[in-house]
Amino acid sequence: MRNIKMPKRVLQGVVISSKADKTVTVKVERKFKHPIYKKFVKVSKKYAAHDSENKYQEGDKVSIIESRPISKTKTWLVVNGE
């Protein structure tokens, strides 16, 4: 049996906190059409992401990728920013 890896999820968001060492909090927003009311709904979620170089500050747009657990709450890595 071959070892086939699933592609990792990639999300784009905005850094809302960079106070912790080597960690940034990224807010990811998504829009979807409500199935009953047919209205577009905007939902946001916060992710703790690993920033090993403390390179990103609040307001930066970044991409995060899924990874192995780094700590209790961190399972995402910052891959690049604008």
From Swiss-Prot:
InterPro entries: NA-bd_OB-fold (IPR012340), Ribosomal_uS17 (IPR000266), Ribosomal_uS17_bact/chlr (IPR019984), Ribosomal_uS17_CS (IPR019979). One of its GO terms (molecular function) is structural constituent of ribosome. Keywords: Ribonucleoprotein, Ribosomal protein, RNA-binding, rRNA-binding. Pfam families: Ribosomal_S17. The keyword 4Fe-4S does not apply. It comes from the Bacteria. GO terms for cellular component: cytosolic small ribosomal subunit. GO terms for biological process: translation. PROSITE patterns: RIBOSOMAL_S17. The keyword Amino-acid biosynthesis does not apply. Part of the 30S ribosomal subunit. One of the primary rRNA binding proteins, it binds specifically to the 5'-end of 16S ribosomal RNA. Belongs to the universal ribosomal protein uS17 family. This is Small ribosomal subunit protein uS17.
